[in-house]
From Swiss-Prot:
Region Disordered: start-end pairs: 1-91
Protein name (record): Eukaryotic translation initiation factor 3 subunit L
Protein family membership: Belongs to the eIF-3 subunit L family.
Annotated organism of origin: Dictyostelium discoideum
Assembly and binders: Component of the eukaryotic translation initiation factor 3 (eIF-3) complex.
Ranges of Low complexity composition bias in the record: 1-65
Length: 611
């Protein structure tokens, strides 16, 4: 047993991989304490579990070894990266049902027939063994969940995911039916807390499944939807916050709502078979857009976060906003609702919804880094598609500065968040090409390092680069009507292609405007006739282009405001046939020289050692 516990401890202290599957990005030094405090009860329960299953090791151990060699391609959104299951860890076989045995055999047959690295199955084989570290972390997770200790729950939540990534890299997690017997008499089916824990574990099970499979089979999608329905129905049907005797850390609550929208987004992009279409036609409520939005609205309404006294949420114990789970779940549902609205192409409504959120530096969305990044990513994208380039630049610059500071102070290393950061740099590059504006110096340097060459091509009006960056950075937009209802051949009506075409059309309108800007910055006054000759276009066409440019110089300021303002580095007006230019270029060279002088003087300051 000591060997197993050491393995579990080592696994806990490795760096956290904060992908979409969950887990917290902070390192805690007290993780080992939880294991040591509860080791006695765990050893007794593990011994009972060993005695119960010691006669079932024959065929299933062989299946487990075959399963470990499967070539399951990981999802781009996350998933375990590595290799083989550790062989020196004590494990206990799982008594598979007949259906699970058939699934395992079918998976092995598929992997043998499809040796290509690009092969991607639509289902995972079941887990065939329970490993001792996983058992330890599961018991810790259950015990801490029952004790309602925020930090202990968060540590156990993080540790359990890491152990699952280590021991189940190419298969599904053990089902809750396999794990409940380990808890013994501790588990009470009549307890609200225990029943809700079962629902939460199932959500983790399906989240892990979606992370490893690009397009899960229809049965898994339906089961995951039904589990979310039970979770939300349990929370929404409560008559009083005192009836819900649970407390979850913010990171887990965010993962819960974020995964709900992710699975909806994934399902909306599915390429379905004929039998799946027939099934969904008879069950239209499965991952329906209206139902997804309705649940988010219901959670927001139930949480009462906007109807309560804004000065003190905890004004009454009878208010659901006084319950931390409802309060934060409602808040995260607002952000997820903004995400859904952006995916559907309703950017105006998304920006209107964001007016409900306090965007201050100490707002609640800053509690979870993934939430912070997601909010500003979709905020910047919504501003970009609404042609509010100045506001998009502000939003993207703000979050990129924040991410840079967190990466230094908190050892912020998350593949998923890093990919989102690269996408935000790409969106900022587009904004800088369409509406040049001043941004943070460090952000500007990083942008030039990542997309400097593409920015130059964008400024020359290269549409192919605009399309390339948009395809890379923009979320994959979806339609409100599922493909199986709108028809099988939906290529012409692809919402993502539609949004791309609208964006490129806007860029085409500004293709000549960039060239016009490069000329008028050289003059304080110039005649329309002369500028038309330089551009080799008709003077009347130039008047139209100048009017268009003047219109696109202006952006609505801020949220909820109707005031218009030009914050670009140049402005002009036309008086009869003369163009009068107000050139307000930032003195970037001057700032650079001043900063260099100050740094140089600082390096020359003598330091005296009086000792």
């Amino acid at each position: 047993m000591s060997q197993t516990n050491n393995a579990g401890t080592t696994n806990t202290n490795t760096n956290q991989n904060n992908n979409r599957k969950g887990g917290n990005n902070k390192n805690y030094q007290n993780r080992n304490n939880n294991n040591q405090q509860q080791q006695g009860g765990q050893q007794q329960q593990q011994q009972q579990h060993r005695n119960k299953h010691q006669n079932q090791q024959g065929n299933q151990n062989q299946q487990g070894n075959q399963q470990g060699g499967g070539n399951q391609q990981q999802n781009k959104q996350g998933g375990h990266r590595g290799g083989k299951t550790p062989s020196n860890v004590e494990s206990f076989p799982i008594n598979l049902s007949q259906q699970q045995v058939q699934q395992l055999q079918a998976y092995q047959q598929q992997t043998q027939q499809n040796q290509s690295a690009q092969f991607q199955s639509n289902f995972l084989p079941p887990a065939t063994a329970l490993y001792t570290p996983v058992i330890n972390y599961f018991i810790n997770l259950y015990n801490n969940f029952k004790s309602q200790s925020h930090q202990d729950i968060l540590v156990s939540y993080d540790s359990f995911f890491k152990s699952c990534e280590t021991y189940y890299p190419h298969c599904a997690l053990p089902t809750i039916e396999n794990l409940i017997p380990i808890l013994g008499d501790k588990f009470e089916e009549s307890s609200f807390t225990d029943r809700f824990f079962v629902l939460l574990y199932k959500e983790i099970y399906y989240r892990y499944y979606y992370a490893l499979v690009f397009q899960p089979n229809i049965n898994t999608c339906v089961e995951s939807w039904q589990n979310y329905y039970q979770i939300f129905h349990t929370l929404l049907s409560a008559n009083s916050p005192n009836d819900v005797e649970i407390d979850l850390p913010n990171a887990w609550l965010w993962d819960l709502v974020d995964e709900f929208v992710y699975q909806y987004h994934t399902f909306a992009k599915f390429k379905l078979k004929k039998q799946d279409v027939d099934f969904l036609s008879e069950n239209p409520e499965i991952w329906d857009t209206t139902n997804v939005i309705r649940y988010l609205y219901y959670i927001i309404k139930k949480s009462q976060i906007f109807s309560a006294n804004t000065n003190r949420f905890e004004s009454s114990s009878e208010d659901f906003c006084s319950h931390p789970v409802y309060k934060m779940l409602g808040y995260y549902s607002v952000i997820s609702l903004v995400r859904v609205q952006c995916l559907l192409g309703d950017y105006t409504l998304a920006l209107k919804t964001l007016e409900l959120i306090d965007m201050g530096k100490k707002a609640m969305y800053t509690y979870v880094t993934a939430c912070h990044i997601t909010l500003y990513y979709y905020l910047g994208f919504a501003y970009l598609m609404s042609r509010k380039y100045n506001e998009a630049t502000k939003a993207l610059n703000t979050i990129l500065v924040s991410v840079a500071s967190k990466s230094k102070s908190q050892n912020f290393q998350s593949d998923h968040n890093e990919k989102k950061t690269d996408k935000m740099y790409a969106l900022l590059t587009i904004c800088q090409a369409l509406y040049p504006n001043k941004i943070d110096e460090n952000v500007s340097n990083n942008l030039k390092e990542k997309f400097g060459d593409k920015l130059l091509r964008l400024q020359k009006g290269d549409l192919s680069v605009y399309e390339e960056l948009y395809t890379f950075a923009a979320p994959r937009c979806i339609g409100p009507v599922p493909p199986y209802i709108s028809g099988f051949n939906v290529t012409a009506l692809d919402p993502h292609r539609l949004q791309l075409s609208l964006f490129l059309e806007e860029v085409k309108q500004q293709s000549l405007l960039t060239t016009i800007r490069s000329y008028i910055t050289l003059y304080s006054t110039i005649s329309i006739q002369k500028l038309a000759g330089l551009l080799q276009i008709d003077p009347e066409d130039l008047r139209v282009k100048l009017t268009c440019y003047k219109h696109k110089l202006f952006n609505v300021l801020g949220k909820g405001e109707t005031k218009w303002n030009n914050q670009l580095d140049i402005d002009f007006y036309i008086d009869q046939d003369m163009i009068h230019i107000d050139n307000r270029l930032y003195a970037k060279e001057t700032d650079s020289f001043i900063n260099s002088i100050l740094k140089f003087e600082g390096s020359l300051t003598p330091s005296y050692n009086w000792m």
